[in-house]
Each structure stands twice: as structure tokens, then as C-alpha cells.
């Protein structure tokens, strides 16, 4: 698989960032802002229209994700709502939409979180990734540490390859 890591796409990758939180707004949303900055640093387009915040409510999350699935977007990244608290419903909203789950993402994310970031608290994460038709969805925790780990170690290194595989 190593030969696929440097896949170049002949177009700009387009992403959407959805922060799920009952308390964050556009000023205090460090996780969503971090996702956006890390993607844009790699020339991934995240327009203002494709960055928003919704409450920890299953219908709100599902509605926004479904809306973006109908648009010209390659990848949707949700932050927040992936834990085990009663209000954490991102996974329940996103997982039923997936055509295929990318199990390795959640497994590797939890492993790296354990080793490099939060230790045994990694078991609380229910981070998930998958595909819906020819689009990718990643649901990750909202902390900036988790965002950086997911984006820098897993998502960004494989993003072009994943999109290439989905669209060939």
C-alpha cells in the first residue's frame, strides 16, 4: 500500500467541517477551527458555507450531513459528540448514513490516542469513519489534541488516496 500514499489529484479537494456542541460558537470552537486550518494548510478547500456548528441533537447532525452529501464535497469531518455522555449522539447520527465503515480509522485513532495523547481515556472515544457513495465522513472528538492527532497522523496522509479509491 505504500506506493499509494503519494497519490496526486488533478483538482482541489473540497471539505466540510461540522462542529457538534451545545456550548461552542464560532469564537470558542477551537476544534472545528483547528480542522479547518489543518485542511487549508494542505490546500483543501473549506468555504465559510461548509463550516458550521450544530447542537448535540441527532436530527440536527443528520440534517446537516445529509445536506452536505448532496453538495460538491469530497469529505465531511465532524468534531465533538463522540464520547459516551448521554448528549454525545454524533456516532448515532452519522453511522447509519455510512455505506461502508472504515473500521481501521477508529481502531488506529484509539491506539494513537492511547499511545500519544490521553492514555487509557482513549477507550471512551467512538471515533468513526466511512463512505457514503463517493464521499468520506470522519467523526472525531472535538478537543484540539484529538483533532491534530486525527488530521496529522491519519486523515491528511491518506486523504488523496482515499478520494482516488472512491472515485476510480
UniProtKB/Swiss-Prot annotation:
GO BP field: Mo-molybdopterin cofactor biosynthetic process
Keywords, comma-separated and alphabetical: Molybdenum cofactor biosynthesis
Residues that span the membrane, as ranges: none
Keyword NAD: no
Pfam families assigned to the protein according to its UniProt record, in alphabetical order: MoCF_biosynth
Cellular component terms per the entry's GO annotation: cytosol
Residue ranges of coiled coil: none
Pathway in which the depicted protein is active: Cofactor biosynthesis; molybdopterin biosynthesis
Job description of the protein: May be involved in the biosynthesis of molybdopterin.
Family: Belongs to the MoaB/Mog family.
Protein name per UniProt: Molybdenum cofactor biosynthesis protein B
Amino acid at each position: 500500500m505504500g506506493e499509494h500514499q503519494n497519490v496526486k489529484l488533478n483538482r482541489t479537494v473540497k471539505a466540510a467541517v461540522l462542529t457538534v456542541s451545545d456550548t461552542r460558537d464560532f469564537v470558542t470552537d477551537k476544534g472545528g477551527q483547528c480542522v479547518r486550518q489543518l485542511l487549508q494548510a494542505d490546500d483543501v478547500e473549506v468555504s465559510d458555507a461548509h463550516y458550521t456548528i450544530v447542537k448535540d441533537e441527532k436530527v440536527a447532525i443528520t440534517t446537516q450531513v445529509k445536506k452536505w452529501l448532496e453538495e460538491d464535497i469530497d469529505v465531511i469531518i465532524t468534531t465533538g459528540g463522540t464520547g459516551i455522555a448521554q448528549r454525545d449522539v454524533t456516532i448515532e447520527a452519522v453511522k447509519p448514513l455510512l455505506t461502508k465503515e472504515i473500521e481501521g480509522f477508529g481502531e488506529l485513532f484509539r491506539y494513537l490516542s492511547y499511545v500519544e495523547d490521553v492514555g487509557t481515556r482513549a477507550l471512551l472515544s467512538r471515533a468513526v469513519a466511512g463512505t457514503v457513495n463517493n464521499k468520506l465522513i470522519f467523526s472525531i472528538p472535538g478537543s484540539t489534541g484529538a483533532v491534530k492527532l486525527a488530521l496529522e497522523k491519519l486523515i491528511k496522509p491518506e486523504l488523496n488516496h482515499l478520494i482516488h479509491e472512491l472515485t476510480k
